[in-house]
Swiss-Prot record:
Gene Ontology cellular-component terms listed: cytosol; mitochondrial matrix; mitochondrion
Name under which the protein is recorded: Tyrosine--tRNA ligase, mitochondrial
InterPro entries per the UniProt record, alphabetical: aa-tRNA-synth_I_CS (IPR001412), aa-tRNA-synth_Ic (IPR002305), Rossmann-like_a/b/a_fold (IPR014729), S4_RNA-bd_sf (IPR036986), Tyr-tRNA-ligase (IPR002307), Tyr-tRNA-ligase_bac-type (IPR024088)
Family classification: Belongs to the class-I aminoacyl-tRNA synthetase family.
Keywords: Aminoacyl-tRNA synthetase, ATP-binding, Ligase, Mitochondrion, Nucleotide-binding, Protein biosynthesis, RNA-binding, Transit peptide
Classification of source organism: Eukaryota, Fungi, Dikarya, Ascomycota, Taphrinomycotina
Gene that specifies this protein: msy1
The species this protein was found in: Schizosaccharomyces pombe (strain 972 / ATCC 24843)
CDD domains given in the database record: TyrRS_core (cd00805)
Known partners and oligomeric status: Homodimer.
Amino acid sequence: MSRLLACLKQLQARSLIHNTTLLQPSCNVNSVYLGADPTAASLHVGNLVALMPLVHFFLNGFPVFTVIGDATAQLGDPSGRSTSRKQMAETTRTANSNSIHNQLKDLSSSILSYAQDCNYPFSQMPSSSQWSIVRNSSWYENLKLLKFLSSVGPHVRVSQMLARDSVTTRLQSPSGLSFAELTYQLLQAYDYSYLYENHSVNLQIGGSDQWGNITAGTDLVRRTHPNANVYALTTPLLTSSSGQKLGKSAGNAIWLDPKLTDSYSLYQYFISAPDDLACKCLDMLTLLPLEQLEQIKAEHEKDPSQRIVHKYLASNVVRMVHGKKALELAQIQTKLLHGAHQAPFGFYSEAPQQGDSFPSLPEIRALFKDCKFYRTIDSSIKDQPFSRLLRTLQIYTSRKEATEHILSGAVSLGHKPILDSNYKFPDNSLFVLRAGKRTFVLDSL
């Protein structure tokens, strides 16, 4: 079986292909690339869907490139947006680019290790040197405007630019479309052309909302190199149960950077996902063998309440993105916060506690101190009435809101509801606070 055929079979079986431009097993794919604009300091879960085909090509021995669009980010990609992006300061864009570069570097090594754990059917064992991370500023910084227009402009038709979905949608919207946004597709097309000429890249991957930008690139390469065989592959978009795209623009991003979304929160995101989304993601976002995926889903169907699919999905994504140690920590934290049996301080355990088997408070603090939901109560606020304390700790937006939730019985400390808005948090204590569906660890030690 050819490398390309093996790779395409994986992508098709995992529902990772939304559309392609005549990409067949008989095609000659040399190198593959995926772009990422540094509009935030981290990639997010939505980016994983487009990243996974690149991973499969990498694991099948193809040279792959991730292109950080630090130059094109100055214009703003209009795809999938109803309004223009806000202009980003150069220092922020540079910091984001550095952060994503380091994240991709860590991901490439973590993914290779994870694939080996999954007994991935490598067509050819890849080398880390086959995954290159580049920035498109490296080829734009010395490119003059007239040179760009004279080399690209003659090969592009304005009618085609205006016909692309990302453009027509915005032209019909109240906010309209800026000239900078209109020309974004030209620069992404030039990225493809540059990579084709300098690195023999002839396949670009992206989300389905990138189809217009990607095919602008294949069109440009074919016009400037009539004998070129270049291809495009897009993936489905990951959407919420309401059909909303999961991305930072929608305000619901789950970040891949553990400093922004800790491993416990990433784990819990998938544990709490709707069944249909979890089953899709199990195929798309893990490297488990295809036969095992079917077995897991069949087992899940016998008793969906056990969330077997969700547990495999959460464990595999955290293992792949954050590593083994992070997964172990997330699983311990999950048992302490969501186990079957009540334990001291509002925590839980997998089995009834016996003797001194439950962790000490310093041990629990060490487990949770880096989590976003961990709150320290220092001497300056420890005597505040409970409703004010919850506002100070940013658990509620106002003291009035906190009081309303306390009086309604929606707030519990330990395993007991707190019904007094003037309650004082005890000194030298560490408790689990549950505020509606949210969980926090409060520490006054």
